[in-house]
Amino acid sequence: MDSFVSTYVWPAAIMIGQSLLLLVCLLVFIAYILLADRKIWAAVQLRRGPNVVGPWGLFQSFADLLKFVFKEPIIPAGANKAVFLLAPLVAVTLALATWAVIPLNQGWVIANINVGILYVFAISSLEVYGIIMGGWASNSKYPFLGALRSAAQMVSYEVSIGFVIVTVLLCAGSLNLTDIVNSQNHGLGTMMGMPASLLDWHWLSLFPMFVIFFISALAETNRPPFDLPEAESELVAGFMVEYGSTPYMMFMLGEYAAIVLMCALTTILFLGGWLPPLDIAVLNWVPGIIWFILKATLVFFMFGITKAIVPRYRYDQLMRLGWKVFLPLSLAMVVIVAFVLKLGGWA
């Protein structure tokens, strides 16, 4: 009995506890990221933004949560009720499940699997199913058109993201996310006489791929200027037009969980994860989790600024950018990086 408890029960209890702790921290972080998104937009438009609920509006997201929860969910008359209610649950579950393999610091990961980046890519590809289910089950033309746009958009830009990840894997030599971060301890900066610095991170040596990944992440998460699935001027609110109350809140939660995931993934692949920008004692004293959060927040700030200042693309422009610009460019970069690594004897 003791061996059964120590072998199965205790490890399972630890994993459940870690998952719940990560979930609570992630939800609180998303609440404040949502507030930051609104504040950035307000600052660009010379407004104050949310500033009533709590000091400086810090509790605005929690007030919105209560508002959504206590509203009555309304299901359209011709909708498929089961699929209509299941769609937001699928979207938010898949968005949160991806975080199981994201390392926040050295050893701070629930499942440190050797194919972590492949798991993230596979699960994030499934998130479009929640949107398609919601658009189809609403029995309305605007949600259905928004769902079709979302499917085409996500498929188009996942190809470019896949090639970007391949170039990072060629440089890191591993599919494990922790190993990818640790591989950025040496690189271009080490050759220039600045070992373990921000010049070693992949953002510099793979700068074109960093730009492609950032723009593709905007399209993958339906962020402006690529928010075609929910374009207000054309599709009212896209696939969410028939949703309200808690289901709408769950769609929004899944969307922002995916956005924060892309920020974390950008940090891991290109910005050195939890590594400090310089190998000096003062910066090494700062816990790695702090560096990780600061870098992910910086990437989200770039997301927010892009949303506020860049106008929306037309649908044909979006598709042309993905298939005629990013796809050939990312494929060419894979070949170039592989050739350079082989030529330099690093492969």
From Swiss-Prot:
It catalyses: a quinone + NADH + 5 H(+)(in) = a quinol + NAD(+) + 4 H(+)(out). GO terms for cellular component: plasma membrane. InterPro entries: NADH_UbQ_OxRdtase_su1/FPO, NADH_UbQ_OxRdtase_su1_CS. The chain crosses the membrane at residues 14-34, 82-102, 115-135, 161-181, 198-218, 258-278, 285-305, 321-341. It is found in: Cell inner membrane. Its main location: membrane. One of its GO terms (molecular function) is oxidoreductase activity, acting on NAD(P)H, quinone or similar compound as acceptor. One of its GO terms (biological process) is aerobic respiration. It holds the Pfam family NADHdh. It is an enzyme of class 7 (translocase). Coiled coil: none annotated. This is NADH-quinone oxidoreductase subunit H.
